[in-house]
A protein has these predicted regions:
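Helix-biased detector of long, well-ordered alpha-helical tracts
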Residues: 1-175
Length: 175
């Protein structure tokens, strides 16, 4: 396979057929979908979004949180919590984890998100830190909201999405 995401054709053949068998209340069944949901009842829909980033800068975790939260906001879901998994190269030290956690805590406090789980491990096959963020939220009355699109509620590169791009530009300019 080539580097990066698999193509939609490969995803349909190898993934979609497997997960489609008994799961009728879920969404997010395309290779390019950034979030998915599980309809619990007519009143509640649990929605989550995952983002992976890698790189040397501990600030990468900030972009991942903003991206995951932004994906939920684009679906009219207020993010409430994040779960974090971090893979480090064996050459990493504890200070890298502390730096990532400091930034993670700051961004979660700013955005009102709680941190529900943090897993960190090192592996010999990892060349630079890889951070996986999963944000979750609950959409109230999902069926009713899908029917009502109110003018002026469109998201056009603002909020978390616009913030992520702006922060990346600022960090690059300062470097």
């Amino acid at each position: 396979m080539r580097t990066g995401r698999v193509t939609q054709t490969i995803w349909n053949r190898s993934v979609k057929k497997q997960i489609q068998k008994g799961n009728r209340n879920s969404t997010g069944k395309t290779a390019w979908e950034e979030s998915s949901s599980e309809l619990i009842s007519d009143e509640k829909d649990f929605v989550w979004s995952s983002t992976s980033v890698s790189g040397k800068a501990p600030a990468q975790v900030k972009y991942a949180v903003i991206k995951s939260a932004g994906d939920l906001a684009a679906k009219r879901v207020r993010p409430t919590a994040v779960s974090v998994q971090i893979l480090f190269p064996e050459s990493s030290d504890e200070q890298e984890l502390k730096d990532i956690m400091r930034i993670l805590t700051e961004i979660c406090e700013e955005t009102g998100l709680s941190i529900t789980c943090v897993q960190a491990e090192s592996a010999e096959y990892v060349l630079r830190p890889v951070i996986q963020i999963t944000a979750v939220g609950v959409k109230e009355n999902p069926k009713q909201q899908m029917k009502k699109w109110i003018p002026g509620t469109e998201i056009i590169l603002c909020g978390y999405t616009g913030l992520e791009g702006t922060l990346r530009l600022v960090d690059e300019a300062e470097a």
